[in-house]
């Protein structure tokens, strides 16, 4: 009964968005209200509350869970979404987006390659460096600027922002996953490398299938060409990511793998792709190119310098100007670094780039204010969804859903292990949060199934437990595609207010395929 009650918020959200075609902000807010009521009146009687909170007031527990969710929504998720769209609006205002469009089309006039370059290559790079929605918001906005339809731009950006999310924000999700199951609470480099490699192996077919889907969504009439490009780009992507994961760990697969994909796409475009005979090449000087790309170049510099790839700066930023909010009852403290978050890096990069492009600081602040006002419904959506996820977590609903799946599947559990991770990401919108929620569950089930030794998985030897634990992040990357939070980001980026349900409906078949294939790979490896 607990599992059935716990799944009500997820089902309700689907029904409201898909069945009743209710706008995302209304669906999310109504689902939050229902979730709070379930937590207040059903969680305790059904024994869903975790032992550490069994003696706490359910009213206080639920209330503080909502507060935590709202804090997480604003700091940093909404700030990052706002700044990502602000950066694009600067390009539109300065008209430098026209130069970027011409430069992209000068690489090739093949729309499929352009889309793949943006959502798979550039999007993967953004995910690897920053995460938190930038890899959906920025590529989708650029695609709109290149003349692609909003629905198409939203869908391909969501499909593209998947495999890289496991190693997003310089590897935080997989590092967190390993730390959660490590006996000491801090995973060894060897464990992180092994788990990273396992996740990439489990995702390997999707490195080819997803580029093929993206290319086919762009051009349905050249399937053979699409397959050749997908094989070329996908095999290079997965090979580079595997080498990075196996030897270096979780920090570099998405970043270096995406750079390799960008190079592979450009090489194919220059060597093999046919160019239109009537295409007129337009050249730009270095200063013109620098001016056009200054927004994203400065963003890239700030993210790299402030991130984990630059430890001294990263350590300084993380230990200065940090606000802490104690959350009674929950027994936790919410911390936010004012100078270490990706939102600030986006703001600084975009603003300095805007000044380089000739806009005054006053004009830039007007653009920021206008962008903020236009995102008011997205604010409601994101705040409601993250608060909902927090309530489901502390009331025990998410654990009840996972436990129900374990009980039903038995020895076939590895087949559905990625689904657990996908549910976590669907509810929370975060691969990292999904790993925090379910890493220990996956390790516990591995122990129950007798997966306590070592084995060889598709030619790679390692821990059986780590193989099943890696399945969580494998599924979590697929759940990212249909997470209402990701849908809300795509909706805002493509100016598709009220179209959340349509985007979700379009993405579901690809997400289901993704999660099923991930499950098959995990099961075959056991």
Label for each model-derived stretch:
Residues 7-19, 31-43, 81-86, 123, ...:
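Hydrophobic core segments of alpha-helical transmembrane domains in multi-pass membrane transport
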Residues 112-124, 150-163, 189-207, 381-384, ...:
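Alpha-helical transmembrane segments of multi-pass membrane proteins
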Residues 1-8, 73-77, 130-135, 192-208, ...:
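Structural signature of hydrophobic alpha-helical transmembrane segments
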Residues 75-77, 88-95, 125-135, 163-171, ...:
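Short helix-coil transition sites and intra-membrane helix breaks within transmembrane domains
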Residues 1-86, 98-99, 103, 280-285, ...:
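Hydrophobic transmembrane alpha-helices of multi-pass solute/ion transporters
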Residues 134-144, 158, 171-182, 403, ...:
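Re-entrant/interfacial helical elements at transmembrane boundaries that shape
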Residues 24, 166-280, 474-526:
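Juxtamembrane and boundary regions of transmembrane helices in multi-pass small-molecule transporters
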Residues 110-141, 145, 379-392, 408-444:
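Hydrophobic alpha-helical transmembrane segments of multi-pass integral membrane proteins
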């Amino acid at each position: 009964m607990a599992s059935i009650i716990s799944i009500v918020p997820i089902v309700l959200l689907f029904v409201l968005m898909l069945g009743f075609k209710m706008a995302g902000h209304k669906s999310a807010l109504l689902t939050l209200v229902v979730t709070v009521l379930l937590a207040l009146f059903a969680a305790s009687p059904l024994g869903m509350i975790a032992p550490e909170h069994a003696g706490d007031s359910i009213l206080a527990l639920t209330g503080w869970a909502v507060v935590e969710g709202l804090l997480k929504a604003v700091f940093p998720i909404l700030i990052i979404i706002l700044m990502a769209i602000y950066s694009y609006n600067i390009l539109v205002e300065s008209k430098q987006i026209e130069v970027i469009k011409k430069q992209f089309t000068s690489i090739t006039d093949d729309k499929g390659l352009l889309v793949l370059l943006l959502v798979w290559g550039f999007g993967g790079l953004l995910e690897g460096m920053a995460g938190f929605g930038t890899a959906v918001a920025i590529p989708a906005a650029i695609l709109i600027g290149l003349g692609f339809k909003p629905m198409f731009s939203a869908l391909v950006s969501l499909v593209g922002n998947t495999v890289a999310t496991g190693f997003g924000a310089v590897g935080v999700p997989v590092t967190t996953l390993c730390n959660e199951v490590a006996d000491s609470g801090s995973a060894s480099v060897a464990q992180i490398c092994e788990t990273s490699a396992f996740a990439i192996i489990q995702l390997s077919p999707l490195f080819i299938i997803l580029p093929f889907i993206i290319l086919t969504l762009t051009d349905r009439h050249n399937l053979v060409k699409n397959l050749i490009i997908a094989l070329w780009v996908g095999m290079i992507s997965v090979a580079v990511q595997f080498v990075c994961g196996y030897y270096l760990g979780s920090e570099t697969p998405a970043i270096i793998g995406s750079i390799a994909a960008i190079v592979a796409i450009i090489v194919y475009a220059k060597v093999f792709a046919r160019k239109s005979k009537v295409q007129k090449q337009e050249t730009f000087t270095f200063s013109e190119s620098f001016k056009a790309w200054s927004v994203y170049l400065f963003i890239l510099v700030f993210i790299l310098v402030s991130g984990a790839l630059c430890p001294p700066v990263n350590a300084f930023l993380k230990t200065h100007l940090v606000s802490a909010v104690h959350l009674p009852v929950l027994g936790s403290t919410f911390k936010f670094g004012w100078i270490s978050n990706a939102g600030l890096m986006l703001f600084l990069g975009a603003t300095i780039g805007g000044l380089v492009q000739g806009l005054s600081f006053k004009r830039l602040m007007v653009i920021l204010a206008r962008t903020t006002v236009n995102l008011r419904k997205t604010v409601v959506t994101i705040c409601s969804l993250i608060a909902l996820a927090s309530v489901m977590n502390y009331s025990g609903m998410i654990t009840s859903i996972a436990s129900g799946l374990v009980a039903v599947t038995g020895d076939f559990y590895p087949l559905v292990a990625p689904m657990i991770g996908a549910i976590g990401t669907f509810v929370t919108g975060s691969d990292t949060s999904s790993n925090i929620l379910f890493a220990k569950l996956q390790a516990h089930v591995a122990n129950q199934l007798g997966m306590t030794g070592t084995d060889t998985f598709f030619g790679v030897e390692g821990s059986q437990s780590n193989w099943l634990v890696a399945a969580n992040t494998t599924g979590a990357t697929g759940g990212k595609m249909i997470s209402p939070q990701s849908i809300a980001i795509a909706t805002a980026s493509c100016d598709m207010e009220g179209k959340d349900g349509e985007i979700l409906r379009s993405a579901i078949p690809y997400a289901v395929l993704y999660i099923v294939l991930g499950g098959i790979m995990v099961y075959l490896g056991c």
